[in-house]
Amino acid sequence: MCNENLKHAPIMPIAAKPSQYGIDPSLVKRRVAELPGMCSLRLAELFPELPPVIYPGGQDALDKLYQVAMEELRKVDMSFIKPGQSVNILASHHGFTLLGGQPYAILIKATRDAIIEKTGCKDVRLRAGVGMRFRETEEYIRRYQLDEYFGPGKTKGVAPIDEGIPIETEVGTLYGIKAVYDADWIVHCHHTDVREVHFHRQVDKAVKPFGMSYARIETRSTYHQNLGPRAANFTARAIFESPFVQSKFAFASFLNVGPHGVIGVDAD
């Protein structure tokens, strides 16, 4: 029998947002969570062994997440980044779909702030790749005020149809997006969420954006048109391990995500 004590009031989704890819939010009259009989189950009650979460949480949850991120990022050796150089923080659209998007935006902001704090480098930019909609991250950048946070001309949404750059790898020439690599250094800002596990069975998930969000369509299409999602995992790894990318790779910052929320940050 169902334990009624496990049932809680429905957790409401984030409010509908204006987008060129969706309907006007004013047309959304009712959410599924508002239908009769709906409830929410708390995973921490079903699985007590789950670690505590930072977010969702109280009103200061995002502030706590920022502090956790800064503590981890301050441990990273960034001594090779010089004040007069440039750094691109690389992000992917998936991160903005996690728990409303705010936690990923916080990680991006903290990554920027830590670089400036530790190195004195002022030319820190954001390059955010897309999923199925070529300009969706431009909307995310504005929605989370990342354009204001980074400053004029420092943020860009990049798409697989943008100008490319050839990257020589152990399997031949593959193609990245030129704007992704137009800085002295790159920082890979990602997450551990497993919702897209069907694409890769967790094989090389950590570097998948190098063959997707950061790649030109000729290379990105290997996941879907050429070899299939799982067989094509080697393309992202090949790009990441290429001499060109390794010459620019500084470090990575990851949002650690459980099925019940954000549990931490890892940077290395």
Regions found by a protein language model. Name each.
Residues 59-67, 94-105:
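Short, glycine-rich nucleotide/cofactor-binding loops
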Residues 134-201:
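An acidic, phosphate/nucleotide-engaging active-site surface
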Residues 84-93, 122-137, 152-163, 252-258:
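Core alpha/beta catalytic barrel or barrel-like domain that forms the active/cofactor pocket
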Residues 101, 105-152:
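Membrane helical hairpin/interfacial module
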Residues 87-91, 111, 174, 187:
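Buried hydrophobic positions in well-ordered alpha/beta secondary-structure cores of metabolic enzymes
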Residues 170, 176-181, 189-268:
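Catalytic cores of enzyme domains
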Residues 2-64:
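N-terminal amphipathic/basic leader segments beginning at the initiator methionine
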Residues 72-89, 120:
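Glycine-rich phosphate/diphosphate-binding loops that line cofactor/substrate pockets in enzymes
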